[in-house]
């Protein structure tokens, strides 16, 4: 597996455990790309849902993917602060087509004051039965929910003060 290069524009593809496409982001600019870490940014990019519907993101976002963790984090810059949407997912993979991951339903929404809510537990339970997630996936995801909430409390990684603002400033250099 290679990794995207800084300045490159890539698609992001989200899949479900059964291999079906879940969602695609048309264009994300890579700000940092290594074997273990990818940081990207997008603004008003087209998103295509599995049923073919499309919509456009409303605000600039910084995307954080790590090869060793079963989650990715999107920091969205809004007028009243940075909101984070964290997807419990497989670590990322990258090929010539796109940056890819498997979405495992559970999400954590983090507010500007760093309070958070775990979302979609019912969807996770339903899909784990339908798609027959193996028990090891459940164990890995629960461990990563704990790891992610620890990062939120410690303001570590993408939750560090100024992380999103710093990467957004870098993104602006590519837009001009």
UniProtKB/Swiss-Prot annotation:
HAMAP family: Ntdp (MF_01568). Has nucleoside phosphatase activity towards nucleoside triphosphates and nucleoside diphosphates. The lineage of its organism: Bacteria, Bacillati, Bacillota, Bacilli, Bacillales. Its cofactor is Mg(2+). SUPFAM superfamilies: FomD-like. The active site is at residue 23. Mg(2+) 2 binds at residues 105, 107, 120, 123. It comes from Bacillus cereus (strain G9842). GO terms for molecular function: magnesium ion binding; nucleoside diphosphate phosphatase activity; ribonucleoside triphosphate phosphatase activity. Its EC number is 3.6.1.15, 3.6.1.6. InterPro entries: DUF402 (IPR007295), FomD-like_sf (IPR035930), Ntdp-like (IPR050212), SA1684 (IPR016882). Belongs to the Ntdp family. It catalyses: a ribonucleoside 5'-triphosphate + H2O = a ribonucleoside 5'-diphosphate + phosphate + H(+); a ribonucleoside 5'-diphosphate + H2O = a ribonucleoside 5'-phosphate + phosphate + H(+). The keyword Metal-binding applies. The keyword RNA-binding does not apply. Mg(2+) 1 binds at residues 87, 103, 107. It holds the Pfam family DUF402. Coiled coil: none annotated. This is Nucleoside triphosphate/diphosphate phosphatase. Gene3D superfamilies: FomD-like (2.40.380.10). Keywords: Hydrolase, Magnesium, Metal-binding.
